[in-house]
Amino acid sequence: MTFWSHSHPRARKAHRCDMCSRRIDPGETYLRGTGLDGTAWTWKECAHCEAARLIYDISDGGEEYDPDLFDGWASGVRGAGPELRAAAGYQSRWRTQSGALWPIPMRAAA
């Protein structure tokens, strides 16, 4: 039997993003996945990684979460514009040098 669910809770304590490894601070909203697929599992993804994954379709076409897909995407982005900024944000764990969070990536206006 396979079961999974997703929610967007507000962090009450610090968590670690399973995609970029950055700290999800208390008060931040994040994606939390839970499932049972032979074994029980949980998945936490910061709002930045979730937005980038959805905007730039970073997936293998399945339901699997794989940080290697993000690494491949970020290292393969060329040119300029919002996608390059998002890749740079991911590579810096969505933090500026001073420690402030980058803005959450947004889909470019058509």
PLM features: what roles do these ranges have?
Residues 1-8, 58-110:
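Short, intrinsically disordered terminal segments enriched in charged and Pro/Gly residues
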Residues 2-14, 35-40:
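Short, flexible, mixed-charge glycine/proline-rich loop motifs
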Residues 4, 30-32, 41-46, 71, ...:
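Ordered hydrophobic segments in well-structured contexts
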Residues 17-20, 46:
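Short cysteine-rich clusters marking metal-coordination/redox-active sites
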Residues 20, 30-31, 52-53:
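Conserved short hydrophobic patches within well-ordered secondary structure
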Residues 26-30, 56-59:
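Short Cys/His-rich "knuckle" micro-motifs
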Residues 42-64:
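Short metal-binding segments enriched for Cys and/or His
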